[in-house]
């Protein structure tokens, strides 16, 4: 290992949030879960109606369950900027479709982790929901969406 090189520590890469277009800006560790504060890396400041450059209006926080590390639930708090167009008054949010589906409560990585748990490791929905820190109903409904994608991709 004489030629071993190391990169600087990067929590975004370690948690694979960079694959979802997110960057970790802070963390808080609790005994029963971990909370990661994130921001969306890509800018989305152009109006989708008229094409003018929007003005940052405010920020909202979207909470997602992410894949657990060491069976500790990981919750991601994503700061999503809202923009307003000065020309047509249209208001929109930054695009975070790379990280999660609209109105989803699990990140795309959490859905992938849960499907792997069901298909490969034969875990129950209750165990997956517990590991993700969500209710059984949320885990079951999100897995139903992933199951349709999994089965639909086979044909």
Where are these regions (language model features)?
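Short, positively charged, Gly/Tyr-enriched micro-motifs
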Residues: 46, 51-54, 60-155
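A broadly conserved sequence feature marking short terminus-proximal activation segments
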Residues: 1-61
